[in-house]
């Protein structure tokens, strides 16, 4: 039996939304008051902190804590979703070297301005960006100030680089991949996120 108060650290698998993961718990355990601290992209896997009952009051405090991700950028193409689930928008046959990537990392530490992905949960005039995208609406997402505490390469091959990052609230790894690739004079998208 599950308590009707407290926290569940749910390991969300790939290819389901955070919303679907929460609804499954809500339905299967007849929980009325439930919420989550942050959202994981559908293609991402990892821990999704879920608050139940009175614990939902703590969500704003948990949400501001630092997050750690491991992710891989595939170089050479930018997609509509900034991950491997989207359609290819742009392509390049230029792949950055490990040395070029390492030199750019320093520019991204600390506070940076970041434009969230076109397909995201960001609200624009009360409507989620992903809904506007599906309806083929034209819209602009304003940049947000985000924080990167640490960023390091964990693995590199010709067309892919894996990283580990510690970042603050509101950071989009997909946006980072898109912008970082453009800064390296190529295109890129997230092919794995954990």
Region spans (language model):
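Catalytic/RNA-binding core of pseudouridine synthases
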Residues: 1-194
